[in-house]
Curated annotation (Swiss-Prot):
GO biological process: sporulation resulting in formation of a cellular spore
Other noteworthy facts: SWP2 is a major antigen recognized during host infection.
Membrane-crossing segments per the record: none
Signal sequence residues: 1-18
Protein name as it appears in the record: Spore wall protein 2
The keyword Cell inner membrane is annotated on this UniProt entry: no
Glycosylation sites: 308
Location, primary (coarse class): other
Sequence repeats: 357-368, 369-380, 381-392, 393-404, 405-416, 417-428, 429-440, 441-452, 453-464, 465-476, 477-488, 489-500, 501-512, 513-524, 525-536, 537-548, 549-560, 561-572, 576-587, 588-599, 600-611, 615-626, 627-638, 639-650, 651-662, 663-674, 678-689, 693-704, 708-719, 723-734, 735-746, 747-758, 759-770, 774-785, 786-797, 801-812, 816-827, 831-842, 843-854, 855-866, 867-878, 882-893, 894-905, 906-915, 918-929, 930-941, 942-953, 957-969, 972-983, 987-998
Subunit structure: Component of a complex composed of at least SWP1 and SWP2.
Organism: Encephalitozoon intestinalis (Microsporidian parasite)
Lineage: Eukaryota, Fungi, Fungi incertae sedis, Microsporidia, Unikaryonidae
Length: 1002
């Protein structure tokens, strides 16, 4: 506006100077009058016009010219310019035309006045008229909106006519009749009529009060100017005065309710002064309260509606003012540009308009180099080109120009190189190309341009290199390509472009290199490739692309390097920190949960086969590797986590599959075919369930050591101390409970099956042994029982043997709490678990196989050496500190128990055929099962209830285990209806499946 005022003043003063020419037509009466009436020029310019005009008239009267043209022609030409615009100046030279004498022999002089009018005065006047009309239309629109709002409020008030439903007076009259009171027949109708009358009166009172307030306000606003109305709205006074309608309504409602009660009470008082009973008083007071609540609710609803309308008006007026201000700025700049180009023509180069055009070009000039070109000029190089110019190089091109190189091209120009191209230009190189241009190189290409290199290409352009390509362009290199472009290199390619290199490619482009490729592009290198592109290198490849290198590959791409490869890509190389849940094949640092083959630091849950370094997640698929995480699929490796699948390795976690190795810190339970379950409950075919087993051994493990309070209902063979339930399956042992299956042992309970042992209970089977306190009978052919009865062919049963030595070991040293039922040959001091598979190593546990080494324990195989223990196998060595039992053919069993054919089982228990199982228990065929517990072939299920085929449901499982998991640890209050074999503490329901257990309440 400052520029507008300056130019108007300069142009008007130039017109004044031009009128000093000695022609009477020069008097600028029209412009002076127009700007004076419309208050567009300051008074000093008007005074200057008057002064110059009067001086010029005096000069012309003293020097009349002689012309050769006819007086008629000259006079006609002099009268042409705007005769209707006259002021006081015209009277002083009204005789100008009559005093001129034109010679017929010579032509009239050139119409200087007309030429000057066309050149400056007339365009300025017309420009002022257009600007005035623009602003006047806005003011009228603003005022009409406020008046319409008040009119609508009046309409709502006029339509406020609620009808009170009235009370149930028939019931009151019947009650009075039962009391012996004679009531006239029309009493109920009379009471209802009072309700209707009071309701109508209150409605009219509310309407009259509100209509008066709003009508007065409408009258005052109608007489206001725009600025006064705007101040009224912006200050909140308008909304406050409208809301005042409801300020005194509540007292009116209360008064009306009291009148209603008094009039209805008078009806009964007319019948009898003493008739007013408690029933009548209560009924009429209840009707009054109902009346008051009804009208309070109705007026509250009306007030809410009016307040919402007031808020809507305020919001719409603010939007109108903002939009109109923007439009007027562009309009005024366009108007000013016309006389600027015509008058100055870029002649001022040192300090004029040409050099100073560093700001924004928002009009229709055609040039807006360094500034922001928001109009229809055509050029807006360094600034922001937001109009339909065609060029907006360095700035932001948001219009339909076609060029918006360095800025943001948001229009349909086609070029928006450095800026953001958000329009349909086609080019938005460095900026953001959000339109249909086709190019949006450095910026964000969000339109249908096709190019959005450095920015974000969110449109259908095809190129969005450095930015984010979110449209259907095809290219979104550095940005995010979220459209159907095909390229979204550095950004995020979320569309169907095919390329989304550095960004996130979430569309069907095919390339999403550095970003996230979530579409069907095929490439999503650095980002996240979540689509069907095939490449998602650094990001997360969640689609069917095939590549998702550094990001998370969650689709069928094949690559998901640093992120999570959740699709069927097949590759997820270095730094994959996400989770690979698809069939890619690689999911390095992240979690590989698909069929990729690699899931290094994350969780490899698919069928990939590989999960190299730093896999901290869980490998639940068929990848083959799941190092630090939990490998729960068929991968083959699951180092520090829990390997619950068929991988082959389960280092630090729980080895619950057929891996062969479960080293240190195995805290979970072995519920599958692994061979060991250290601190937890061994409910599967493992063979061991060391210390703290509070639940029951319901599977084919063979052991259930300390604190087994449940019953051994499966084919385990052992159920040591504290077994309070009954052993109804083929386990072989049922200590304190009743051993009714074919286990072979039933210490304190009743051994009614073919176990071989029944200590404190009755031994009715062919076990052969019934040690201390056997209150039952010995009915088999064992032959020996030191402190108990030794009924097998071992040859030895030393001190403290609380269990039964039923295999061919030959030794059962001190504190053997479990039962050595296989051909290992060793069961040293404190042997709490049992190694019943063919692992080869069982350090702290029991070495019952043909390994060859059993350090501190008993060497019962053909090894040749047994230092502190007895070496009875063919290993040749059994050094010191062997606390477990080596029952397989491995040859070594340091600290843990190696119960499969692996050859190594350092700190944990390796119960499958993998060869390695470091810290956790690997219960599936993965090879790794580190820290958690896997009860199926999935690979994991820690704290909740595992009701599906997942494999896990550890602590706090309050529901029932209804699937084939095998585990339902603490607090299982429901019933075990599946083939799990376990229902530990607090199982209050019944065992209706094939588990054979129902602990505390069965």
């Amino acid at each position: 506006m400052i520029k507008l005022s300056l130019l108007l003043s300069l142009a008007s003063f130039t017109a004044v100077l031009a009128n000093q020419r000695p022609r009477c037509q020069r008097c600028p009466v029209s412009s002076s009058k127009y700007f004076q009436q419309n208050n567009l020029l300051e008074s000093r310019f008007q005074n200057e016009v008057q002064r110059l005009c009067a001086r010029r008239v005096r000069e012309e009267s003293s020097s009349e010219s002689s012309s050769s043209s006819s007086s008629e022609d000259c006079s006609r030409r002099r009268r042409r310019p705007h005769r209707e615009w006259e002021d006081s100046c015209s009277s002083s030279y009204s005789s100008c035309s009559s005093t001129d004498s034109c010679s017929s022999s010579a032509p009239c002089p050139p119409p200087v006045a007309q030429r000057c009018d066309i050149e400056l005065k007339t365009p300025i006047i017309l420009m002022g008229e257009r600007i005035y009309e623009f602003l006047k239309n806005y003011e009228d629109q603003y005022k009409k909106a406020v008046l319409l709002f008040l009119t609508n409020i009046l309409s709502q008030i006029s339509g406020f006519n609620p009808v009170f439903p009235g009370g149930d007076y028939d019931a009151l009259i019947e009650q009075l009749k039962t009391l012996g009171v004679t009531v006239p027949a029309n009493t109920a109708a009379e009471l209802a009529a009072i309700d209707a009358a009071e309701s109508s009166a209150l409605t009219r009172a509310i309407q009259a009060n509100a209509q008066k307030v709003i009508s007065d306000l409408l009258t005052r606003v109608s007489a206001m100017c725009y600025l006064d109305i705007m101040s009224l709205v912006n200050s909140g006074l308008l909304a406050s005065q409208v809301s005042s309608v409801f300020n005194n309504i509540q007292p009116i409602i209360t008064i009306a309710g009291n009148d209603l009660f008094a009039k209805q009470m008078a009806v009964f008082q007319k019948l009898s002064k003493t008739l007013i009973s408690t029933a009548v008083t209560n009924a009429l007071q209840g009707n009054r309260a109902k009346f008051t609540r009804f009208y309070t609710t109705q007026t509250s609803n009306l007030q809410t509606s009016v307040q919402n309308s007031s808020k809507t008006l305020t919001s719409e007026l603010k939007k109108l003012a903002t939009d109109t201000e923007t439009a007027f700025t562009a309009f005024a700049n366009a108007e000013i540009s016309t006389p600027v180009r015509r008058i100055f023509r870029r002649s001022i180069t040192s300090s004029g308009f040409e050099d100073a055009e560093e700001g924004e070009d928002k009009d229709n000039t055609g040039e807006g180099e360094e500034g922001e070109d928001k109009d229809n000029t055509g050029e807006g190089e360094e600034g922001e080109d937001k109009d339909n110019t065609g060029e907006g190089e360095e700035g932001e091109d948001k219009d339909n120009t076609g060029e918006g190189e360095e800025g943001e091209d948001k229009d349909n120009t086609g070029e928006g190189e450095e800026g953001e191209d958000k329009d349909n230009t086609g080019e938005g190189e460095e900026g953001e190309d959000k339109d249909n241009t086709g190019e949006g190189e450095e910026g964000e290409d969000k339109d249908n341009t096709g190019e959005g290199e450095e920015g974000e290409d969110k449109d259908n352009t095809g190129e969005g290199e450095e930015g984010e390509d979110k449209d259907n362009t095809g290219e979104g290199e550095e940005g995010e390509d979220k459209d159907n472009t095909g390229e979204g290199e550095e950004g995020e390619d979320k569309d169907n472009t095919g390329e989304g290199e550095e960004g996130e490619d979430k569309d069907n482009t095919g390339e999403g290199e550095e970003g996230e490729d979530k579409d069907n592009t095929g490439e999503g290198e650095e980002g996240e490739d979540k689509d069907n592109t095939g490449e998602g290198e650094e990001g997360e490849d969640k689609d069917n692309t095939g590549e998702g290198e550094e990001g998370e590959d969650k689709d069928n791409t094949g690559e998901g390097e640093e992120g999570e490869d959740k699709d069927n890509t097949g590759e997820g190389e270095e730094g994959e920190e996400g989770e690979d849940k698809d069939n890619t094949g690689e999911g390095e640092e992240g979690e590989d949960k698909d069929n990729t083959g690699e899931g290094e630091e994350g969780e490899d849950k698919d069928n990939t086969g590989e999960g190299e370094e730093g896999e901290e997640g869980e490998d639940k698929d068929n990848t083959g590797e799941g190092e630090e995480g939990e490998d729960k699929d068929n991968t083959g490796e699951g180092e520090e986590g829990e390997d619950k699948d068929n991988t082959g390795e389960g280092e630090e976690g729980e080895d619950k599959d057929n891996t062969g190795d479960a080293e240190e810190g195995e805290e979970g339970e072995d519920k599958d075919s692994t061979g060991e379950g250290e601190e937890g409950e061994d409910k599967d075919n493992t063979g061991e369930g060391e210390e703290g087993e509070e639940g029951e051994d319901k599977d084919n493990t063979g052991e259930g050591e300390e604190g087994e309070e449940g019953e051994d209902k499966d084919n385990t063979g052992e159920g040591e101390e504290g077994e309070e339930g009954e052993d109804k399956d083929n386990t072989g042992e049922g200590e304190e409970g009743e051993d009714k299956d074919n286990t072979g042992e039933g210490e304190e309970g009743e051994d009614k099956d073919n176990t071989g042992e029944g200590d404190e209970g009755e031994d009715k089977d062919n076990t052969g042994e019934g040690e201390e306190g056997e209150e039952g009978e010995d009915k088999d052919n064992t032959g020996e029982g030191e402190e108990g009865e030794d009924k097998d062919n071992t040859g030895e049963g030393e001190e403290g043997e609380e269990g039964e030595d039923k295999d061919n070991t030959g030794e059962g040293e001190e504190g053997e709490e479990g039962e050595d039922k296989d051909n290992t040959g060793e069961g040293e001091e404190g042997e709490e678990g049992e190694d019943k598979d063919n692992t080869g190593e069982g350090e702290e546990g029991e070495d019952k196989d043909n390994t060859g080494e059993g350090e501190e324990g008993e060497d019962k195989d053909n090894t040749g050496e047994g230092e502190e223990g007895e070496d009875k196998d063919n290993t040749g060595e059994g050094e010191e500190g062997e606390e477990g039992e080596d029952k397989d053919n491995t040859g070594e069993g340091e600290e843990g128990e190696d119960k499969d054919n692996t050859g190594e089982g350092e700190e944990g228990e390796d119960k499958d055929n993998t060869g390695e199982g470091e810290e956790g228990e690997d219960k599936d065929n993965t090879g790794e099962g580190e820290e958690g517990e896997d009860k199926d072939n999935t690979g994991e299920g820690e704290e909740g209830e595992d009701k599906d085929n997942t494999g896990e449901g550890e602590e706090g499982e309050e529901g029932e285990d209804k699937d084939n998991t095998g585990d339902a640890e603490e607090g299982e209050e429901g019933e075990d209806k599946d083939n799990t074999g376990d229902a530990e503490e607090g199982e209050e329901g019944e065992d209706k499946d094939n588990t054979e257990e129902g602990e505390e309440t069965t």
